[in-house]
């Protein structure tokens, strides 16, 4: 179920304050954040946010196309390594 329209999008309070402060100054710098559940709002467009994936901060440049998505969508937490190709041959020999 999606979030109620009357509540508005969830954005971490400190993250929003940092972005508003940078917008007032007209500065662009990388902002580190652990708030993966925050929704991307139009005020964030043009900024680079370093989103934590559990190991490192992954830089995400915010564009108009990303508005409405969550920050965590762009910082994958799991690293898939392909399945072993010769696994059947190894099992037959045992």
Swiss-Prot record:
It comes from the Eukaryota. Pfam families: Ribosomal_S19 (PF00203). Keywords: Chloroplast, Plastid, Ribonucleoprotein, Ribosomal protein, RNA-binding, rRNA-binding. Disulfide bonds: none annotated. It is found in: Plastid, Chloroplast. Belongs to the universal ribosomal protein uS19 family. Protein S19 forms a complex with S13 that binds strongly to the 16S ribosomal RNA. This is Small ribosomal subunit protein uS19c. It comes from Cyanidioschyzon merolae (strain NIES-3377 / 10D) (Unicellular red alga).
């Amino acid at each position: 179920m999606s979030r109620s329209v009357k509540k508005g999008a969830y954005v971490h309070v400190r993250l929003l304050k940092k972005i508003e402060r940078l917008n007032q100054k007209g500065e662009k710098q990388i902002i580190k954040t652990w708030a993966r559940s925050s929704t991307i709002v139009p005020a964030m467009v043009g900024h680079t946010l370093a989103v934590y994936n559990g190991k490192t901060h992954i830089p995400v440049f915010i564009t108009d196309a990303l508005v409405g998505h969550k920050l965590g969508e762009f910082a994958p937490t799991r690293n898939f390594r392909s399945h072993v190709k010769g696994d059947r041959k190894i099992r037959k020999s045992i």
